[in-house]
Design a protein with these regions (language model features):
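Repeated scaffold domains used in trafficking and secretory/extracellular systems
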Residues: 52-59, 98-109, 140-153, 204-207, ...
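Loop/turn-rich, solvent-exposed surfaces of beta-rich toroidal or solenoidal domains
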Residues: 257-294
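C-terminal motif of bacterial Sec signal peptides marking the signal peptidase cleavage site
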Residues: 16-18
Length: 344
């Protein structure tokens, strides 16, 4: 890598409420200031008909892309389905009344996971219809998005609705046990934050699982920090992208007007982690085009793609070398570009 690694030190102690008690392990915090490949990308604009919301929900199952529809445009179905490549319209899938009871939909490999107050339902494409194939009862259905680790275990992030100060939790459906893993990057101080909820909101983060189930990545919204764990919850890597324009604070300010929103979302493949980085100053009304940061599962930065349009959701097909994006500001367009040559 051409950038500079500056070594800090993160003491990872699993002793907080709701977290599994483990031996203290010293993991260095590694700062990265550049990418081996830093590329300006011009994306193809593919018109979508019928027009969809396609703002936050872009789901790909095999060679089918599902984009969320608005209730005004279609009161019966949740998704419009298109064939890849080319975005040929196939039809509508997913009963709106069935999906309306859910709080969140997560993407799995050839599966969708619908979280609701009674648990979680697993959906797959059967022919050209989206069908529920199994259900999982949960202790508390108000979980954030869950991601499949293996046949029995699921990972979900620790947000302000959950107890404890762990990075994430592992839920085991075989015995309905929940185990907390990792700790927040900062210690809660009531002199800074009015309560734990405000602290956890400032350090809001998401999780993704490597498709083979061997790794978990945690990425933070208000700091360009990411952590990689093994599938038992042991921290393997603690990294932070440290560059200016705008800079990223190591510790998040309790003042929302000082916040910079960095990692919006992520997509995980067996080879790379793709982080959608907005770098948006929250006190500003302007929106810059985001960039996508590619990191391998050892924590090393690989590439940065500077996009020429604003997107809020994306999907990566490494086998076919394609990147797809959708935007809240352009609901009738899907953006695409080839990534294979850019990652060589």
């Amino acid at each position: 890598m051409k950038g500079l690694w500056i070594y800090g030190c993160t003491l990872v102690a699993f002793f907080l409420i709701g977290c599994t008690r483990q031996k203290i392990v010293e993991i260095p915090l590694r700062y990265h200031s550049s990418f081996p490949k830093d590329v300006d990308v011009k994306m193809e604009e593919i018109p979508v008909s019928p027009k969809t919301e396609s703002t936050w929900e872009m789901r790909v199952l095999g060679d089918r892309m599902l984009l969320a529809t608005s209730e005004m445009d279609n009161s019966d179905y949740k998704y419009a389905m298109f064939e890849l490549p080319g975005m040929k319209f196939i039809g509508y899938v997913g009963s709106r009344s069935e999906f309306a009871r859910g709080t969140m939909v997560a993407q799995g490999k050839d599966e969708l996971y619908l979280m609701h107050k009674d648990g979680m339902d697993v959906y797959r494409l059967v022919g050209e219809t989206l069908q529920k194939v199994s259900s999982l009862g949960l202790i508390d259905g108000d979980y954030p998005a869950m991601h499949k680790l293996d046949v029995n275990r699921w990972v979900y992030g620790n947000d302000h609705r959950s107890d404890g100060l762990c990075d994430f939790y592992i839920y085991d459906s075989s015995d309905e046990s929940v185990r907390g893993c990792g700790v927040y990057p900062n210690v809660y101080d009531r002199r800074q934050f009015k309560d734990v909820k405000a602290f956890k909101s400032a350090y809001a983060h998401g999780t993704r699982v490597k498709p083979d189930g061997s790794r978990v990545v945690v990425f933070y919204n208000a700091t360009r920090r990411y952590r990689i764990y093994d599938n038992e919850g042991a921290l393997l890597y603690d990294g932070m992208m440290d560059y200016s324009n705008p800079s990223s604070a190591l510790l998040v300010s309790p003042d929302r007007n000082q916040l910079v929103w960095h990692y919006e979302s992520a997509f995980a493949t067996d080879k790379y982690i793709y982080l959608l980085c907005m770098d948006r100053v929250m006190s500003s009304n302007s929106y810059n085009n985001p960039n996508v940061q590619v990191i391998d599962w050892a924590g090393k930065p690989i590439a940065r793609f500077r996009l020429d349009a604003y997107i809020t959701a994306f999907h990566v097909d490494e086998d076919k070398g394609e990147f797809y994006g959708a935007s809240a500001t352009n609901p009738g367009i899907v953006f695409a570009f080839g990534i294979a040559s850019l990652l060589k």
